[in-house]
Amino acid sequence: MALMQELYSTPASRLDSFVAQWLQPHREWKEEVLDAVRTVEEFLRQEHFQGKRGLDQDVRVLKVVKVGSFGNGTVLRSTREVELVAFLSCFHSFQEAAKHHKDVLRLIWKTMWQSQDLLDLGLEDLRMEQRVPDALVFTIQTRGTAEPITVTIVPAYRALGPSLPNSQPPPEVYVSLIKACGGPGNFCPSFSELQRNFVKHRPTKLKSLLRLVKHWYQQYVKARSPRANLPPLYALELLTIYAWEMGTEEDENFMLDEGFTTVMDLLLEYEVICIYWTKYYTLHNAIIEDCVRKQLKKERPIILDPADPTLNVAEGYRWDIVAQRASQCLKQDCCYDNRENPISSWNVKRARDIHLTVEQRGYPDFNLIVNPYEPIRKVKEKIRRTRGYSGLQRLSFQVPGSERQLLSSRCSLAKYGIFSHTHIYLLETIPSEIQVFVKNPDGGSYAYAINPNSFILGLKQQIEDQQGLPKKQQQLEFQGQVLQDWLGLGIYGIQDSDTLILSKKKGEALFPAS
């Protein structure tokens, strides 16, 4: 067998040939592996496991799904690891799956040793591995060449039911996932079909790019840092898909070298990466939206699993090592053309553009498309061009359950964790005015422009005009002190962007609905 050519000594113009010659699996070899794996699948489907310890007496496998590289069609040549997810009849909820996960693994482990078909394939090294979640791992051999294959089995709750494999599940599925309060990724196997299909139904050329990135990662990152806590291959796959979607607008005809260089460039800037999709879950549901918004506020890099909003597949890994290796890769022949010029990369933003809904009292709302990494001063320029304001713009936003925050012109939306559709409030002030926030009993708040020397009564008049609560029924507090109508804001030390608490005076009518 010829020695494999080094990627780093392959010119960029030859990358397509490199993938075809060295990375694309041979059909005969792939079929031989899958033939052995089919024996495992048949065992799982046909065997009835005897349940104990609170499980159903008759535990059956409802469905077996190949996941990972063999499942999504991006397997590399000579890959000997196959992952299977077994959906079981005894799991009726995420909570049950978590409670009985290890019991089921023991049942399968015990029964496998009694299967003559598996023993004929040289079943050995059968063990339970601690993962997220735990899995059953063992080795079998192919029938023809006796090549060893490592197979992983993960039992799972069939949360999606018999729904169409690439359609958006009902929001209730994700609501129950979020309420189950499992650790990140604990219930990912329940969504493995969606994870697989997210990659599987992609153009052939993109799969070539995925193979190239995975080969680089295995040979030049993982192999050289075997003990480091490195990101999973799935994270690299998702990053590559994002680069292709944004860089080519999902064009099936692209230059492989440009795609590869783009992924390396993105890896250099891992600290600002924030990626998510809404293919399978929608942000129109309040519980799902809250879950995703909380994820997007975390430390980057953020690559949310498109099938599981509770899992950031990029969290907690040594991306700095990956970035170092990417920097080295960009200096190699595979990233230079025949004239020794560096290959250009696609223009890929580190986060998707988002919609901002701008609200202002007395004016209809309007929408802007901005990038989270744009400076807020540029957002204000867009507002000025749209509405023609000449005064000082004060922008603020509020997340449910939190205080209203002023958006500083020197920062970006990303600084405030804003990476999805958000409503912001516009207040136009003149130089002598400050902005104050008034928090209602329901937790919502409004922004008001007022001269710091104005009386408290003047602010109450604005509140009455905007919210309908008469001045006489209002009670305002600042830092625990009730504010008197005929004293100025400055007397109380109220400064720009401070928050006042609004309540109803005792014995008054209910607070008007907003």
From Swiss-Prot:
Species this chain originates from: Homo sapiens
PANTHER family tied to this protein: 2'-5'-OLIGOADENYLATE SYNTHASE-LIKE PROTEIN (PTHR11258:SF16), 2-5 OLIGOADENYLATE SYNTHETASE (PTHR11258)
SMART domains recorded: UBQ
Organism placement in taxonomy: Eukaryota, Metazoa, Chordata, Craniata, Vertebrata
UniProt-recorded name of the protein: 2'-5'-oligoadenylate synthase-like protein
Modified residues (N-acetylalanine): A2
Gene3D superfamilies: 2'-5'-oligoadenylate synthetase 1, domain 2 (1.10.1410.20), Beta Polymerase, domain 2 (3.30.460.10), Phosphatidylinositol 3-kinase Catalytic Subunit, Chain A, domain 1 (3.10.20.90)
GO cellular component, one term: cytosol
Function, in words: Does not have 2'-5'-OAS activity, but can bind double-stranded RNA. Displays antiviral activity against encephalomyocarditis virus (EMCV) and hepatitis C virus (HCV) via an alternative antiviral pathway independent of RNase L.
Induction: By type I interferon (IFN) and viruses.
All residue ranges annotated as the Ubiquitin-like domain in the record: 354-433, 434-509
Domain of life: Eukaryota
Keyword flag Repeat: yes
CDD domains with a match to the protein in the record: NT_2-5OAS_ClassI-CCAase, Ubl1_OASL, Ubl2_OASL
Subunit and partners: Specifically interacts with the ligand binding domain of the thyroid receptor (TR). TRIP14 does not require the presence of thyroid hormone for its interaction. Binds MBD1.
Keywords, sorted A to Z: Acetylation, Antiviral defense, Cytoplasm, Immunity, Innate immunity, Nucleus, Repeat, RNA-binding
Gene label: OASL
